[in-house]
């Protein structure tokens, strides 16, 4: 099924980065005519060169510096719940090959075809940070797709990232699902931690530090460890589990 979207055009020469794989077009690269300026933030658009060559489908925000974010290089792409589910399924399959337990960064924004969206999975809970107007309009479909593809019971849509303000979004958060209270377990490198997905920093846990925690743990056997600005205690507890003689964690 073909989908018709409003059209925006790039200024002459502005197509080079997009044609070489960059996923964004900045506001000063787009011919901001009256029709483009009138589009609602987050609208799906067909993006073209100045001479009408099709470059794909993007989400568009005329009020943002990053005005267009490419969703697909196919001009015929349909962006709906089915498309979102396919992208999340692909992301899940990739992560399940890397990790033996379902505790990981499920979606890495543009890298997984979800511009401005980060999703962390804590077994049957997922935390989703939606930082673009286009993805905000699809937030319920994203949550549904995550639940359908992973089987999680709750999806927390966190809206407290300051990046959202650049897109004209508010800071409200909500839970899709039966709800939850308090902390959740995080299993990483054989150690069970606790994280607060509702009000902890960002999604409640820094999965990008997994390898660094594992590296520090290798050095910890018999050592005295000081973990300053410990937050959830990820580094200190990893060292303790690896045989550190003494661990001091400091935060405020």
Q: What do the PLM-derived regions correspond to, one by one?
A:
Residues 1-122:
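Non-catalytic accessory regions of SAM-dependent methyltransferases
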Residues 40-43, 65, 151-152, 222-223, ...:
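Short coil/turn connectors at secondary-structure junctions
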Residues 80-87, 134, 138-142:
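Short amphipathic alpha-helical segments
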Residues 107-120, 136-206:
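Non-catalytic substrate-recognition/targeting regions of SAM-dependent transferases
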Residues 125-130:
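Carbohydrate-binding surface patches
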Residues 178-252:
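Rossmann-like S-adenosyl-L-methionine
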